């Protein structure tokens, strides 16, 4: 956070005026799809927010890619919190959800079909129960990609388990998640901390004789909120979530942009991102069909990484 001193190290975090935007060289080398995405931005802060938001939302879809970091297998998943005062443009993050909406919708439709088949099978089982020889049908998994941020802890783990440990927590108001984590039924902060490192997560409730376990979770998180909402979610630096989140802070600016730039619904940001979501859905289907991938940095970039972070 800007203008907040780290009392233990004595170092000052950069002031809000010093916070940089992503350099132009980043945008000069984007993949073609991401280039289409950021071309819908209306300012530098908007472009940065859309880029990092898109990367985080798409990261949950690349569960077939892994690499080795610090001698451990890692996946592309990231945790993001876009921080800004009210009315400063953090709402651009909501557009990024449209990029994965078709995939989420397809999974919901699959769940409905499986649920209907299950009900029909159960009816047949009940009618033929007296005859014997019939096996009780198994309840189908609840398939989805985007997990509601107000889910209870057991529901969160159940949904993860139903989806092979894959899920995106997306909320444009970060206090929804912080309120959920503070409640008795929804405190899965520990699950999020472990899921970041793809560690086995589990939950046991004695009252309901309930036990949930998910191995190799691959969870991405995209949140937006005000500085106060960050403090509610992560009260201090000792909280383990602090080191797991990427924070992008939108600087305070006076004035108003032209909110009447277009009157054409087909040219609205909503319409453009829905088209991009449909395009990504097709790209994703083809990508997953190709199989699994492993990623590693070239040795010269590994050396540059170590050298840079050793300064």
Predicted regions and their residues:
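Phosphate-handling catalytic cores of nucleic-acid transaction enzymes
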Residues: 1-311
